Amino acid sequence: MKLATLKDGSRDGNLALVSRDLSRAVAVPEIARTLQEALDAWDVAAPRLEQLYAQLNEGKLARAVAFDPRQAHSPLPRAYQWADGSAYVNHVELVRQARGATMPAEFWTDPLMYQGGSDGFLAPMDDIVFPDESWGIDFEAEVAVITGDVPMGVTLQAAESQVLLLMLVNDVSLRNLIPAELSKGFGFFQGKPASSFSPVAVTPDELGGAWRGGKLHLPLITTLNGALFGHPNAGVDMTFSFPHLIAHAAKTRALAAGTIIGSGTVSNKQGGGPGRPAASGGVGYSCIAEQRTVETILAGQASTPFLRFGDRVRIEMLDDGGHSIFGAIDQTVSKS
């Protein structure tokens, strides 16, 4: 099934079911007022939601209305936890290669992960607002999952059953603030402002055979100012599956229902080399930083600028029939 959170003036919005074709929506306060409320009692709420979802897709719910993604929050407007991994080690390897650093062997066996701010996410069509372009504004197109209650020490096998919903992410990053921040040895904070998520979150069964092995095997499409920037396949070159990321996060702590785990920037090796931009016939990249990294490797310096005020970023994933699965993250960068 497909779920969204509609804006109603409150912090957490109203939970709604969205039809498979993203055309219709219906609020479900009789089951749960918010997505978090549904997640807290998923075993009870999910069967009732599935029943209504079937009726919605059959056109049997007279109270359904047209679904307008502009009226949608991120599925969880705020969350108990947002932990973003770096499952595509190719991305990390390229960044290190560009600065002449070797790749530690453990990066292939032990995932990187940071804990981001989750007290308030951007809506999928909100502007990305900052006072200064010089901060190095960038997008990161990713896939994320929402978990149920995950016990500490969960096994890989059990972790996959805790993937309740999937969605897309724009992990907004401020590249020029990150180096000084990381040099302190205490992780991201200012360099990782509020992220945004797709208008709709979907259960794994909606993805059919594209969801297998704890990975989503479909291209993740990013456009910048209407031009294709990247369409790498999210299931290719994903070193760590979502169950692996969940188990990593839960090694020393339990994860509450509603925890969001991100994949990190989707990145494909493209024939074993640094790859090619989409404009040159390659699958391109899911963030500007990776394209700049490849430019540095090949030409000695980066030439693609980071985002500027007025730039528009769109992130979307289509099924095999060309239909949008999650709706689009569609944001414009603007000056505060």
Protein language model features and the residues they cover:
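Active-site microenvironments in enzyme catalytic cores
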Residues: 1-12, 17-21, 29-232, 239-244, ...
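Short, surface-exposed secondary-structure edge patches
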Residues: 79, 134, 251-253, 303-306
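Residue-level recognition of short, solvent-exposed, well-ordered loop/turn junctions
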Residues: 83, 256, 308-309
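A beta-strand-loop signature enriched in Asp, Gly, Thr, and Trp
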Residues: 212-264, 268-280
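Active-site pocket scaffolds in enzymes
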Residues: 261-309
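Structural signal for terminal/edge beta-strands and the immediately following C-terminal loop/tail
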Residues: 313-336
